[in-house]
UniProtKB/Swiss-Prot annotation:
HAMAP family: IPP_trans (MF_00185). Its EC number is 2.5.1.75. The gene is miaA. This is tRNA dimethylallyltransferase. It catalyses: adenosine(37) in tRNA + dimethylallyl diphosphate = N(6)-dimethylallyladenosine(37) in tRNA + diphosphate. Monomer. ATP binds at G9, P10, T11, A12, S13, G14, K15, S16. Keywords: ATP-binding, Magnesium, Nucleotide-binding, Transferase, tRNA processing. Substrate binds at T11, A12, S13, G14, K15, S16.
């Protein structure tokens, strides 16, 4: 039976390159698990591989949402599970590539999403309108520090959703998620790229500089014409949020660059914390030869 391979780890650690290498070795197809690469036109700012960089490897779950659409982990899960099972039915190996934590978990684990209640949600949305997202996120931190650690403090939708789940279940939001010691769906093997700040931080700064040099601002300007706004899932993405703020005169371009770098580093710390808690991950050194190490772990070298 074909076994999917998941490639996880922090931003700028080389997941896409490792995914391509494994797909070549294993006759695989890539399923994207980066939430922002799901959006059409969000290319430069998400380091989405170009068609040429995909080296003839089929990719799924890229460019499937308009920037006006609200992200949905449940929708992604349904669509991506169908992709994985289709790839397996054709005798090919699904290579799941991405670092979006909840999206990875929704795919690798059989996550049954908790209930919703429109009245409870409306109450928290009213609270959000009254005190603002950062103050509401602070309340989430008091109730459930682990959930707050993986939800950005400028993300109103996920903050409200976490509070709704906590009230409805009487448990922390994290308790609604599958345990990280359960067998992964399909027996998926999870390969993680291990990095150090000393190695990764310069790569983050270099990548951010390259984004701006390659036309990131023009990309955002084009997406604004397609309906991108600051108060949306896509508009809150790291980098896009800062460019939109600079375009609106709310910060300088120098600040936009620096805040993109610091925002990415902050996100990387959350990714490290999240994936380090998952003992099913087999780690390879991102600064060495991760492909050879991964193949050895998989018993293929």
């Amino acid at each position: 039976m074909v076994t999917p391979i998941a490639v996880v780890g922090p931003t700028a650690s080389g997941k896409s390159a490792l995914g391509i290498a494994l797909a070549h070795k294993l006759d695989g197809e890539v399923v994207n698990v980066d939430s922002m690469q799901l959006y059409k036109g969000m290319d430069i700012g998400t380091a989405k591989l170009t068609v040429e960089e995909r080296e003839g490897i089929a990719h799924h779950q890229l460019d499937v949402w308009d920037v006006t659409e609200t992200a949905s982990v449940a929708r992604f899960q349904s669509d991506a599970v169908a992709d994985v099972e289709d790839i397996m039915s054709r005798g090919k190996t699904p290579i799941l590539v991405g670092g979006s934590m909840l999206y990875v978990q929704s795919l690798v684990d059989d996550w049954q999403f908790p209930p919703t209640d429109s009245a409870v949600r409306a109450r928290f949305e009213a609270r959000l309108a009254d005190i603002g997202v950062e103050a509401l996120h602070a309340e989430l931190t008091q109730l459930d520090p682990e959930a707050a650690a993986v939800i950005e403090n400028n993300d109103p939708r996920r903050t409200v959703r976490a509070l709704e789940v906590i009230e409805l279940t009487g448990q922390p939001f994290q308790a609604s998620q599958p345990p990280k010691d359960a067998p992964p769906r399909w027996g998926t093997r999870i390969i993680g790229l291990k990095t150090t700040p000393e190695w990764l931080n310069p790569r983050i700064e270099q990548r951010t500089a390259m984004m701006f040099e390659q036309g990131f601002v023009a990309e955002v300007e084009h997406l604004v014409q397609q309906g991108l706004i600051a108060d949306s899932t896509a508009g809150r993405a790291i980098g896009y949020s800062q460019v939109l703020a600079a375009m609106a005169g709310e910060m300088t371009w120098e600040d936009a660059f620096e805040r993109t770098v610091t925002g990415t580093r902050r996100y990387v710390r959350r990714q490290r914390s999240w994936f380090n808690r998952d003992h099913r991950v087999s780690w390879v050194d991102a600064s060495g030869d991760p492909t050879a190490q991964a193949l050895e772990i998989l018993g293929l070298q």
